[in-house]
Amino acid sequence: MYHLFHSRLCLPQGLRSLLAQRMPAAKLLPNDSAVAAYARHRRVVAVGDRVSETLIRHGVKPWVMVFDCVEARRDKTCPSIPEGYAILRTRNERSTVEPGAVEVIRKALRQGHTVVRVDGEEDLLALPALLYGDVGSVVLYGLPGKGVVAAAVNREAKLLAMRVLEFFEPC
């Protein structure tokens, strides 16, 4: 699976509508309270500014937070970072998965209590988080206008993430 990330991968137009939906077998959490309740006793990887902010505001400390300080294509204040968290930075262009960003995600997943601050866009980094996350953990990411997707990291989710990434094109 690592061979996928030797070069930048671009999201093909045909996959955009698929990725704008909830993953099969994932839960859709409709509001902040549901997100916090679901995440409270789990190892969570939060992908996105709003998801990260929601968890921190409700006293949930994610294992890893990935955000870009942009929401709906507008700059915003970065989520607050809990004391004791390491901060890693990476670059990831819009509609891509960059090899360097994947390596930073893997490092963050290994060490935990880490923020990955993305220059560019973090949305598609939920896929490598699923691919490399520990079985039993959960990846939370926003689905604009619908809520937050909670995708359990298990064998099936890893295979699905890998299959989706295999449709991306080197660019």
From Swiss-Prot:
MF-aspect GO terms: GTP binding; kinase activity
Enzyme class: transferase
EC number: 2.7.1.237
Pathway: Cofactor biosynthesis; coenzyme A biosynthesis
InterPro entries: GTP-dep_dephospho-CoA_kin (IPR007164)
Chemical reaction(s) catalysed: 3'-dephospho-CoA + GTP = GDP + CoA + H(+)
Positions of GTP binding: 49, 51, 68, 122
Domain of life, source organism: Archaea
Gene Ontology biological process terms, A to Z: coenzyme A biosynthetic process
Keywords: Coenzyme A biosynthesis, GTP-binding, Kinase, Nucleotide-binding, Transferase
Family affiliation: Belongs to the GTP-dependent DPCK family.
PANTHER family in alphabetical order: GTP-DEPENDENT DEPHOSPHO-COA KINASE, UPF0218 PROTEIN TK1697
Function summary: Catalyzes the GTP-dependent phosphorylation of the 3'-hydroxyl group of dephosphocoenzyme A to form coenzyme A (CoA).
Name of this protein: GTP-dependent dephospho-CoA kinase
Species, as recorded: Hyperthermus butylicus (strain DSM 5456 / JCM 9403 / PLM1-5)
